[in-house]
Regions:
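Secretory targeting and sorting signals
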Residues: 2-24
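C-terminal PAP-associated
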Residues: 25-447
Length: 447
């Protein structure tokens, strides 16, 4: 993220928390672990994402940002910028860690989303996310940009692919061109597109379509102002269709399965919010992102993370935060038209944020989040459900709280993330325990 970001999230440090109803039994959790995986104090290293190769579960990719911050981060901790990268990517770069032995050994390398060598006019990189498809192909989305001219169109989101577990990557494709991007077409837009920021990505494993929603400034025929868009690739990220405007900017984790893509959005200011004007809307496309429909809900708020049940068409879940700070699970079985509250995870004394969801093909629903105390310190928790969100087993993954950030801070800590296998929840998050932002990973086994 290119703007200041603060952390937040979970629950008390009990070994097991049972969700609604309190007497229900959730999955059994064991083998909890955490580990710091980045160590270069010249950079603030956070905003991570994680994916596990379904063809080889020992192959894991973890992406994160190497935040230079014009040298402030390194100088603050006794490591002034001295290498070439610090001068060429003066604000942010994007890196990955890859392992082929389940995390015993990691290899770090720069992701070819952006660099000075690729394009000196937009060398910085941010906002990376990673996922694997069922064939073992990895996809990473990220931004390349120049600061501060990204605000006027010198920056966009791009996608790269890897066919060898993250060792090598394809050349990037442009997802939604801005004014100064390759593929820019002001004539077709009848105006301009500029300022790309904070995106999310989903894969429909049934159709193979990739979806990205993000924030983009537009002064064009389809939208005016800071808006949210939905872009679709129907050929594995090689090319992208026109990114359709869907409403007020509020990018959040989206979900796709069985030909349906779904995510939440604030209710329109000019109506369309249904009976509850302070409740979120659900945006749905059933034609591969060519058009969208908007459904009002009775779920308070303006956004909530979404996840798709890969076993059943039209089945999705939303995790929203209620007035008491709990995570409340809502489900739909008709593609977003109607929602039912099915479960709840209490987060006593903390504020849940940076929520990330996953739903395995085996039917395990998972969630991870960071829980912030009133003083700004936080820990990381994960939870899994075997009954579609009615009951959860919750486990703290981080051993101790991270202190809040008290130093110089520019950007680069938007996300935490989880990934489910058939019997494990893996998680990654940014942590300030060493006084510098570093990436941790952890998880647990469930049965």
């Amino acid at each position: 993220m290119r703007r200041t970001a603060l952390l937040a999230v979970p629950v008390f440090a009990a070994s097991l928390l049972l969700a609604h109803p309190a007497t229900a039994q959730g999955p059994r959790i064991s083998h909890v672990f955490e580990q710091q995986v980045t160590f270069d104090d010249a950079y603030a290293e956070g905003e991570p994402s994680i994916a596990v190769n379904p063809r080889n579960p020992n192959n894991i990719i973890l992406t994160f940002l190497a935040n230079v911050g014009y040298g402030f981060y390194g100088v603050e901790h006794g490591h002034p910028p001295t290498n070439t990268r610090d001068r060429e990517q003066a604000m942010q770069g994007c890196d990955e860690l890859i392992t082929f032995d389940g995390g015993k050994h990691w290899k770090r390398q720069q992701l070819p989303v952006a660099s000075f060598q690729m394009d000196p006019t937009r060398p910085n990189c941010s906002d990376t996310l990673v996922l694997f498809d069922d064939k073992g192909v990895a996809y990473v989305v990220g931004s390349n940009f120049q600061f501060p001219t990204f605000a006027t169109g010198q920056g966009d989101f791009r996608l790269i692919r890897s066919y060898d577990g993250g060792r090598t990557w394809t050349k990037p494709s442009v997802i939604s061109p801005a004014l100064l991007s390759p593929g820019s077409d002001p004539g077709a837009w009848q105006g301009a597109r500029f300022y790309d920021d904070r995106e999310f990505m989903a894969l429909d494993r049934d159709t193979g379509y990739l979806y990205v929603n993000g924030t983009q400034g537009r002064a064009a025929a389809d939208a005016q102002g800071n808006i949210e868009y939905l872009a679709t690739s129907r050929d594995g990220g090689r090319t992208w269709g026109n990114a359709v405007a869907v409403g007020t900017a509020s990018a959040v984790q989206l979900a796709a399965a069985h030909g349906i893509v779904l995510f939440t959005s604030p209710a329109p200011a000019t109506g369309g919010g249904g009976e509850c004007t302070d409740c979120l809307n659900v945006v749905v496309s059933t034609d591969g992102g060519r058009s969208v429909k908007r459904y009002p809900t009775t779920i308070p708020g303006s956004s909530a993370s979404a996840v798709a049940d890969p076993r059943h068409k039209g089945h999705f879940a939303l995790f929203a935060k209620d007035s008491a700070g709990a995570l409340v699970v809502h489900r739909t079985v008709d593609g977003g038209k109607h929602w039912t509250k099915v479960g709840r995870i209490d987060v006593p004394g903390r504020s849940p944020a940076k929520v990330w969801l996953d739903w395995s093909r085996e039917g395990v629903l998972g969630v991870g989040w960071r829980g912030t105390m009133p003083d700004g310190s936080y820990g990381f928790w994960g939870a899994v459900s075997f009954d579609d969100g009615k009951h959860f087993s919750v486990k703290r993954i981080s051993k101790v709280d991270s202190p809040k950030n008290t130093g110089v801070w520019v950007a680069g800590d938007d996300t935490s993330a989880i990934w489910l296998t058939h019997d494990r929840l893996y998680a990654t998050w940014g942590d300030w325990r060493s006084s510098v932002l570093k990436t941790y990973w952890g998880g647990f086994t469930f049965r």
